[in-house]
């Protein structure tokens, strides 16, 4: 098993880190620059910054927010939310951002994945997939891709889409369960495992981490290459060192 990454996520709205449940009911957590500095000190492997209202509001990523964080991070840094073009990615990479996380734009225009991978290298292109479970008989895939912060159905099967983004040149997948997001009830292990077993690129588990055991389950049962969390880190319930120590003691290789 390769080293597993532990990744905090900054969901940013109006210049503040926020966290909600099922992508709604947001509450203020902290300043994004302060949070980023703290996670760098604690030994996070990467940092993800999501402008969570960009796509919903049909606008680009707020570059001024990204720039403040990019100027001080000392670890790999991915940005998502409102990235819709090669020009957007060029601007982010010029600021020092390491990876672009693209979601709604590539569901609507899958060719953007291969275009971006060819120009920047697949290792810089993350495709974020938001998924939900549908009831049997709904006429929709059981595991379905949703977009616009989970507000819009696509009718796409999540495993089929994951394979498509891999074949198009994505370097990794950031998989978030809309149903589990913010609940602290654990990752959607069925969804995570289904995607991780369908592709050969790394898959990051996201949405629902509430305990140290959930992080472990994401790797062992979900087959994830990285575990992402927000609430538990932002509100001090678990620290990055505590998470890594727990995983290491359970036999999971991590960077200590």
Model-derived features with residue positions:
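Glycine-rich, proline-tolerant flexible connector loops at the mouths of alpha/beta enzymes
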Residues: 46-65, 104, 174-186
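Glycine-rich phosphate-binding active-site loops on the catalytic face of alpha/beta enzymes
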Residues: 91-112, 177-182, 207-211, 217-241
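Catalytic cores of alpha/beta
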Residues: 73, 77-78, 83-96, 190-227
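Structural preference for beta-strand elements that scaffold enzyme active sites
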Residues: 5-9, 46, 74-78, 98-101, ...
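Charged helix-capping and loop-helix junction motifs
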Residues: 60-67, 110, 155-159, 185-194
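Glycine/small-residue-rich loop that forms an oxyanion/phosphate-binding "nest" at active or ligand-binding sites
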Residues: 53, 62-120
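Conserved, mostly hydrophobic/aromatic
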Residues: 11, 39, 47, 92, ...
